[in-house]
Amino acid sequence: IRLYHGSNTVIEHIDLSRSKRGKDFGQGFYLNANPDQAMEMAIRTARFMNEGQPTLSCFEFDETKADEMGLSIKVFPDYSEEWAEFVVMNRKNDSDIPAHSYDIVIGPIADDTVGVQIRRYIMGYLSVATLVEELKFKGDHAFQYFFGTPRAVEFLKRIEL
C-alpha cells in the first residue's frame, strides 16, 4: 500500500526521536493512505512551525510481509470502545516509555479538538460510548498508520511522487 506523510519538509530518513508524545497511538511516525488528508496535515504543520512548505513524502508498505516477519501489528477496523480507550491511554502518556508494545498500529484518526472530552472521560463525566462518538474524526472516515519502532520503520520504502 502507498502511504503519505504530510510535513513542512521532505522526509528522506525517518527519525523516531523527533516524534511527539501524546498522539493517538503513541510516539511514532504517522502516515495516511489518503494523500489529500496527508496534505492537510502538511499545511497545518507548516503553519504551526511557521517554516518550510507543505510537503508530502511517499512510502510503500507491505503489511503482509511485516506480519509474516513477526511484527506486532494492531488493527482497529473502525471506531470502537477499545479504540477510544487505546487513544486515551496514549494521549495521557507523557513519558518516554510507550504505553503499548505494538510495532505498528492501524486505525481511525481521532478528532484533534477533543482534549476536553478526553479529560471529562478520565474524570468519569463521560461514558466510553459517548467518548467514541466525540472522538470520531469530523472529516472523511480517515485511517492512520503508526510506526513506533525502528524495526517497523524498516518496512517503509521511500518512493518519489
Language model regions located:
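Glycine-rich loop/turn
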Residues: 1-29, 37-47, 83
